[in-house]
């Protein structure tokens, strides 16, 4: 019985091995029928703001009138590709991402305006826009060439306490300098006045007034 079970398992493996090339050939032949390529354009380079916000536009050439669209933002760093955010929306409705997503966006016709927030220098990389026209059939898929987003971390602001200490030290230095300058000036003024005064008061006798000159008045007769 064990030998019979082993033979059945071996036969199933052989059957799966034989049908695998047929399955692969089926997908290669019929996937292009259900999935059609679509051109997606996006800017080549974007510089994030000092607050870590980067915005760019994804524009796709829609061959038909799609009513359901899915937008996905992929990040490629070195050889790794990770999904940043994704959203599915109906044409004419607002583009809404998840509440915890770092992405926001709006749609207008065949354009999707994307904004990525909370970026840091370590998030610098190639951000690829992937657009899928989900409904109605046929299914269209378009992948852009990517937007290189550069993020520069702002320089940290100096500590406010440290600035207060510097201000206090400068103020103290200026006060001490002004006090020293005033003391030196007063000392020089006192040294200049010391030779003029002995510091002893002597009562001097009053001087006799000069004799007043006697003038004889005279009259001029008038005829």
Curated annotation (Swiss-Prot):
Residues 1-35 form the signal peptide. One of its GO terms (biological process) is T cell receptor signaling pathway. Residues 46-50, 150-155 are annotated as: Homodimerization. This is Cytotoxic T-lymphocyte protein 4. It is linked to Systemic lupus erythematosus: A chronic, relapsing, inflammatory, and often febrile multisystemic disorder of connective tissue, characterized principally by involvement of the skin, joints, kidneys and serosal membranes. It is of unknown etiology, but is thought to represent a failure of the regulatory mechanisms of the autoimmune system. The disease is marked by a wide range of system dysfunctions, an elevated erythrocyte sedimentation rate, and the formation of LE cells in the blood or bone marrow. The lineage of its organism: Eukaryota, Metazoa, Chordata, Craniata, Vertebrata. It is a single-pass type I membrane protein. The therapeutic antibody Ipilimumab competes for the binding site of the endogenous ligands CD80/B7-1, CD86/B7-2 and ICOSLG. Residues 183-223 are cytoplasmic. CDD domains: IgV_CTLA-4 (cd05721). Homodimer; disulfide-linked. Binds to CD80/B7-1 and CD86/B7.2. Interacts with ICOSLG.
């Amino acid at each position: 019985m064990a030998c019979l079970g082993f033979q059945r398992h071996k036969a199933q493996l052989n059957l799966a091995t034989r049908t695998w090339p047929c399955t692969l050939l089926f997908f290669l032949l019929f996937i292009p029928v259900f999935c059609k390529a679509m051109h997606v354009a996006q800017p080549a380079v974007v510089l994030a703001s000092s607050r870590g916000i980067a915005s760019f536009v994804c524009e796709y050439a829609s061959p038909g009138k799609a009513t359901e669209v899915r937008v996905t933002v992929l990040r490629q760093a070195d050889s790794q590709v990770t999904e940043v955010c994704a959203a599915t929306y109906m044409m004419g409705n607002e583009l809404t991402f998840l509440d915890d997503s770092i992405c926001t966006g709006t749609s207008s016709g065949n354009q999707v305006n994307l904004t990525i927030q909370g970026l840091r220098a370590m998030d610098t990389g190639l951000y690829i826009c992937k657009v899928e026209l989900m409904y109605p059939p046929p299914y269209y898929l378009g992948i852009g060439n990517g937007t290189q987003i550069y993020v520069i971390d702002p320089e940290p602001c100096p500590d406010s306490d440290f600035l207060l200490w510097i201000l206090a030290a400068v103020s103290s230095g200026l006060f001490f300098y002004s006090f020293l300058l005033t003391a030196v000036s007063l000392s020089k003024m006192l040294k200049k006045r010391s030779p003029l005064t002995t510091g002893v008061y002597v009562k001097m006798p009053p001087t006799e007034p000069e004799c007043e000159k006697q003038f004889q008045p005279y009259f001029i007769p008038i005829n």
